[in-house]
Amino acid sequence: MEMFGVHNPAIELATVGLGGAASVRYNFSAAALYEEAIRRGEAELTAQGALRAITGQHTGRSPRDKFVVRDINTDGEIWWDNNKPISPEHFAVLRDDMLAHAAGKELFVQDLVGGAEEGHALPTRVVTEFAWHSLFIRNLLIRPDTAALSSFVPKLTIIDLPSFKADPARHGCRSETVIACDLTNGLVLIGGTSYAGEMKKSVFTVLNYLLPAKGVMPMHCSANVGPDGDAAVFFGLSGTGKTTLSADPARTLIGDDEHGWSENGIFNFEGGCYAKTIRLSAEAEPEIYATTQRFGTVLENVVLNESREPDFNDGSLTENTRCAYPMDFIPNASKTGRAGHPKTIIMLTADAFGVMPPIARLTPDQAMYHFLSGYTAKVAGTEKGVVEPEATFSTCFGAPFMPRHPAEYGNLLKELIGRHGVQCWLVNTGWTGGAYGTGKRMPIKATRALLAAALSGELGQVEFRADTNFGFAVPVSVHGVDGSILDPRSTWADKAAYDAQAEKLVSMFIANFAKFENHVDGGVRDAAPGVKVAAE
């Protein structure tokens, strides 16, 4: 076996059974990985110098093909209602077959770290058969300095072989695609998919399993910090504005997607960003756009024209087009990936039912309730006319990546909020003046003004009213914001229609939360919404 690149000679691929590879390229730089990816026909260069790759059949994650090994250690620790088990025996066969499949191949290795706080970091070795996957994960995780590579010892190994096709009967999985996590032995196997995001989210899943046992809260969130050290955390599902609203030129970006909250404060799990690019423009998101125009960035499933210029408005391959770049490509990004304890937590929702106010203050019990609910709403396409919004509840704002029971994360979050006196807000970036189809999208200018007031502490000084449906505190008036949007009911022409819509949404919340009732205390149960129709 030929070996190239800096690495720890005591921890070679033979230690995980990959000694039969034809060659191994350890910790190659971006330039070297560009050369390899283009030489092998995996990717092509854009006019501006980014590397574009197409993932084929899978243009997003495959949550139905993700499995966790159910063994003596994980049996009582994992939330099996939400995580699919695979037996140790099936996993062993899958592992052996994947190792055999890798024999004779050129492989790429990156030795990286998940977690910017040293005491909670996860040294991770990622073995890939694609050079562009190696560049992707090099961009996304934290890179140790060169001197540290010669003594690097991984605690997690990911083996990523897109050309391997699983056999459901033989391997105990669902299809030819498989993502299998052995949490006890620190091994993740990915086969049958070229979508690079599976690697990133596998690291997140493992950290979400390991950290709560150490009293550290893992979070699917973005985070930033002000000039006075006032950190803020932004929870939110896809499409709620998590990346957009945390990108604030007046504040330093800590990270855009995954963080931990320890006894020392918050820290990024990653060293890069994986941003959506569909309809990306220099005007709306100049910093993210700029990363797509330079060497080192990976563009995933972005359409190029004949001149190799990216067309970010073309979603013909997928709406889930992405770019992956190192954190230091963003001008105001944190160099450490760390900050103190958050002063503010923002929970984002895009309420397409038009019921929720643009901002509401949450008590710790209400914060835990809405964290466990993880609500937003999807809207369908309008080709066949307006359709009903669809409520989406993804507990902890990231159910697919949470191996433990949601109550573990919720109780830890509530305890940290109380201990550090964190102010929590629910921010609705969805619809006002009616539901999707009749109302309009919440003005981004108003959202930014309300957010700025919340982060500065100004919002805490205004008069509040209790929301008649959800019980949380809503500001009556805020300087610089049109007062009419603060009371959603008043923005609807048909008040009875608003009341009916509110009752419908509240009933969805209650039905969804039923599965958590026995796992939370009375204070959180009492934070549930209840309809009280307002006077005309």
UniProtKB/Swiss-Prot annotation:
Give me the comment on cofactor binding: Binds 1 Mn(2+) ion per subunit.
| Any one GO cellular component localisation term in the record | cytosol
List positions binding substrate: 61, 195, 201, 322
CDD domains in the record, alphabetically?
Answer: PEPCK_ATP
- Residues annotated to bind Mn(2+): 201, 220, 257
Q: Which GO terms describe its biological process?
A: gluconeogenesis
Show the InterPro entries listed in the entry: PEP_carboxykinase_ATP (IPR001272), PEP_carboxykinase_C (IPR013035), PEP_carboxykinase_N (IPR008210), PEPCK_ATP_CS (IPR015994)
Per the record, the pathway is: Carbohydrate biosynthesis; gluconeogenesis
Q: Which keywords belong to this entry?
A: ATP-binding, Cytoplasm, Decarboxylase, Gluconeogenesis, Lyase, Manganese, Metal-binding, Nucleotide-binding
Q: Where does ATP bind?
A: 201, 220, 236-244, 285, 322, 447
Cofactor(s) in the UniProt record = Mn(2+)
Gene3D superfamilies, A to Z: 3.90.228.20, Phosphoenolpyruvate Carboxykinase, domain 1 (3.40.449.10), Phosphoenolpyruvate Carboxykinase, domain 2 (2.170.8.10)
Q: Which GO terms describe its molecular function?
A: ATP binding; metal ion binding; phosphoenolpyruvate carboxykinase (ATP) activity
List the catalysed reactions.
Answer: oxaloacetate + ATP = phosphoenolpyruvate + ADP + CO2
Where, per UniProt, does this protein localize? Cytoplasm
Its Enzyme Commission number?
A: 4.1.1.49
Q: Does the keyword Cytoplasm apply?
A: yes
Q: What family name appears in the similarity comment?
A: Belongs to the phosphoenolpyruvate carboxykinase (ATP) family.
> What function is annotated for this protein?
Involved in the gluconeogenesis. Catalyzes the conversion of oxaloacetate (OAA) to phosphoenolpyruvate (PEP) through direct phosphoryl transfer between the nucleoside triphosphate and OAA.
Record-given protein name? Phosphoenolpyruvate carboxykinase (ATP)
Tell me what gene encodes this: pckA
